[in-house]
């Protein structure tokens, strides 16, 4: 992950775009000899994994950066399905059960918030149980004395 001194993600998105372009290249060569199911496995292995890594942090980047990633993801989906370069990808995403870049970012951010709240809840329970245990210990000591 790359972030500059101005706290922008341009360098990271540029690097990520290169990785995603390479993944598109692999899929474009693979699609002629592999099934769609296999191409989807490769998509998850080399495209999706790069796309979603750290998106909780860089997901708040500029609209321009998100658009770059959307273009690459749309190209990837068209490659896998042999769709024309100018065709709409909305139906393809639905048909394949894939999430779009913006949806993946939102989903991962929501998961992080949920995990954080669950951890806070567990921490609260742990503190409460310690407090109860300490109160019981004090009561036992008071009764014994």
What are these regions (language model features)?
Residues 1-145:
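Hydrophobic/basic alpha-helical segments
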């Amino acid at each position: 992950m790359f972030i500059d001194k101005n706290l922008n993600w341009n360098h990271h998105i540029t690097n990520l775009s290169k990785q995603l372009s390479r993944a598109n290249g692999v899929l474009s060569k693979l699609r002629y000899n592999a099934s769609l199911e296999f191409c989807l496995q490769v998509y998850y292995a080399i495209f999706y994994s790069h796309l979603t890594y750290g998106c909780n942090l860089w997901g708040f980047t500029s609209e321009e950066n998100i658009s770059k990633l959307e273009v690459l993801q749309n190209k990837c989906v068209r490659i896998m399905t042999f769709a024309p370069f100018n065709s709409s990808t909305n139906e393809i995403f639905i048909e394949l059960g894939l999430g779009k870049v913006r949806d993946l970012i939102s989903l991962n951010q929501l998961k992080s918030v949920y995990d954080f709240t669950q951890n806070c809840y567990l921490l609260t329970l742990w503190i409460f149980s310690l407090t109860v245990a300490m109160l019981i210990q004090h009561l036992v000591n008071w009764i014994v004395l």
